[in-house]
Curated annotation (Swiss-Prot):
Record carries keyword Oxidoreductase: no
UniProt KW keywords: Cobalt, Hydrolase, Metal-binding, Zinc
Pfam families given in the database record: M20_dimer, Peptidase_M20
InterPro entries on file: Amidohydrolase, Bact_exopeptidase_dim_dom, Peptidase_M20, Peptidase_M20_dimer
Protein name: Putative amidohydrolase YhaA
Species annotation: Bacillus subtilis (strain 168)
Binding site for Zn(2+) 1: 182
Length: 396
């Protein structure tokens, strides 16, 4: 069977799997589990593969699941990855498949990622006698919370002998039929900083006798923006956001301490280093001016997701020739973080976005919103692109 004929047959079989995809996705949506707690989700995935007769490894790097599908002829080892953890958010959707777990929901589409990859695995397994190479399905736990599940799975051998990896994220603000993929950085390094300011408290009526931690902290918050505008090359991109400012005191008491917590985002490692150093320089200077002291910690989170050029071109070419794909665009890099970055630091590959906006505009909500949902037809698009990229990779 020619590769083009095989691809059409696989797409036809994926069409036949769509109702099962929806059923599986809705099951996960109703019974979500938080990062590092995905016991039942992992068990469901393992049971599905066992029903197909596909060899698996469980508890990979924690709760990860690996499935191996061997083609009938030698070829490259291609890995496909889907994450499966949920978020601590109360589901507010009025749909039959809304979360049944209070305070927990799939608000980022990981349920759809998993359902799509299971369908791909099923169809590849059914056609294994026509395939060249080995196909590794990586079902990853704990993407949402650092240190994440990718690195422990890699340390536990999930990429052993792997030549390339592909992954996707269903993107609920982009229309169905859209694929966004570009070489280079596509998602940012996501870091966290904590600043503790130690001043001198006192009565609100006597500010001259104090070292006001709230005033000092406020100046720090404002001055941090000067780093982005004056210390980072304008050709580069960076974000510094202070998300928490804590100085809990009665209304008439000047605070002696304040705690600032925020995030720094960047695409380039040199810029990342600049942000870490310059944040402390700002804190040190302002605290010194006021005669205050400070503690500063900077925690590096996931690195930037950086796509490899040749593999990205392959994915783009595949997507352009995939049924159901209406447009393939570069898109803009996202300031969100993703631990898929670790896979791409170890093997070649690419990460792309699959448009998944619900058909009704009033149902379109951003990721991590309590009313988040996807157009379930996007799972089929994602599955076809992933399968196509995987089975044709040996032609590169």
């Amino acid at each position: 069977m020619s590769i083009s004929t095989l691809q059409k047959e696989i797409n036809k079989q994926l069409d036949g799997c769509f109702e099962e995809m929806v059923e599986i996705r809705r099951h996960f949506h109703m019974y979500p589990e938080l990062s590092f707690q995905e016991e039942k989700t992992a068990a469901f995935i393992a049971s599905y593969y066992e029903s197909l007769g596909v060899p698996i490894r469980t508890n990979v790097g924690g709760r990860g699941v690996l499935a191996n599908i061997e083609g009938s002829e030698p070829g490259p080892t291609v890995a496909l990855r889907a994450d499966f953890d949920a978020l601590p958010i109360q589901d507010e959707k009025d749909v039959p498949y809304a979360s049944k777990v209070p305070g927990v929901m799939h608000a980022c589409g990981h349920d759809g990622h998993t359902a799509a990859l299971l369908a791909v695995a099923k169809v590849l397994h059914q056609n294994r006698h026509e395939l060249k190479g080995t196909f590794v399905m990586i079902h990853q736990h704990a993407e949402e919370y650092y240190p994440g599940g990718a690195k422990p799975m890699i340390d536990d051998g999930c990429l052993e002998n792997t030549d390339v990896i592909f992954g996707t994220h269903l993107w609920a603000t982009e229309p169905l039929g859209t694929i966004l993929c570009r070489p280079g950085a596509v998602m940012a390094a996501a870091d966290r900083f904590t600043i503790k300011v130690f001043g001198k408290g006192g009565h609100g009526a006597h500010p001259h006798d104090t070292k006001d931690a709230v005033l000092i902290g406020s100046q720090i918050v404002s001055s941090l923006q000067h780093i982005v505008s004056r210390k980072v090359n304008p050709i580069q991109s960076a974000v510094i956001s202070t998300g928490s400012f804590i100085a809990d005191n009665p209304f008439n008491v000047i605070a002696d301490q304040a705690v600032l917590i925020g995030t720094a985002r960047s695409f380039d490692e040199n810029v990342r280093d600049i942000l870490e150093k310059e944040i402390e320089a700002v804190v040190k200077g302002i605290c010194s001016m006021h005669g205050a002291s400070y503690e500063y910690t900077y925690e590096q989170g996931y690195p930037a997701v950086v796509n490899h050029p040749a593999e990205t071109n392959h994915l783009v070419s595949t997507a352009k020739n995939t049924e159901g794909v209406q447009q393939v665009i570069d898109g803009e890099p996202q300031m969100g973080g993703e631990d898929f970055a670790y896979y791409l630091q170890n093997v070649k590959g690419t990460f792309f976005f699959t448009g998944a906006a619900p058909e009704q505009p009033e149902r379109v909500y951003s990721h991590h919103h309590p009313k988040f949902d996807i157009n379930e037809k996007a799972m089929l698009t994602a599955a076809k692109v992933l399968a196509g990229a995987a089975i044709t990779y040996h032609q590169l």
